[in-house]
Amino acid sequence: MLDSMLLVDDESLFHLVFEDACNLLNITLQLMTVDSTDAAEKLCQKWQSGEMKRPDCVFVDLNIVGSSVDGIELVRRINHIYGNGVVIGIISSSSDKKEITKATTAGAQFWIVKSDDIEPRLEKFKSDYPGYKSKTLSFKVYS
């Protein structure tokens, strides 16, 4: 079951779009949002120390202005250092095949193409989530 999510995105307006989409889809959960990879890494350290419960799923923007690393590097770090069972993927307006390949290499399980009309993509993701959690579903692009 999908109870908690972390959205890492530098666009505060998209935080609202994402939250509204979750509400429209009856995804009732704890949603945390941060605007930089640095803030996300601080949360990851809290997961590792047990100070904070890990989210079930992490959505990371590809290009996050003002961050020390890009979204793909954050995906790699979360997967290899802090992840241990967290479903993680990229959410970006880009659908560049080279970037998608880098994301899969870093350990991303999915890629959602960002838009103002994100609900249909999130709805498909929501139905696929159990497959990602059980690691029986392979990488997928939602566009």
Each predicted region: which residue ranges?
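Short amphipathic alpha-helix used as the core "switch/output" element in two-component signaling
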Residues: 69-84
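Alpha-helical interaction/dimerization surfaces of two-component signaling modules
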Residues: 20-25, 102
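Alpha4 helix (beta4-alpha4-beta5 surface) of REC/receiver domains from two-component response regulators
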Residues: 69, 73, 94-112, 116, ...
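Conserved acidic segment of CheY-like receiver
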Residues: 3-22
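Acidic, metal-coordinating helix/loop segments flanking the phosphotransfer/catalytic sites
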Residues: 19, 33-57, 121
